């Protein structure tokens, strides 16, 4: 994603959520028609500035749901600033595990995402 798309209007968290929702609408659908993934609006996502592979990154954690359906679960998202290529690399992971603990699954997603390395 171009740097300007994340950093426009100084509303970084809103821009990241907008990108998540647009990707969810296009690529992540439920088993019935006219359903797609969106970020749940009832709760504000957790948002933190951090570093991954010595690069500025924004961590966003929250809950996703399927629009027009009854599926939901936690997600974790990293937007990693890649100045060399004038872009943000977006990493997004989510889990669906009805009626079961999701904490360990989210920890696994987080560990995989934090291990990203940029090659020269």
Show where each model-derived region lies.
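Surface-exposed amphipathic alpha-helical segments
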Residues: 86-120
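Conserved polar/disulfide-associated segments of primarily extracytoplasmic proteins
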Residues: 1-91
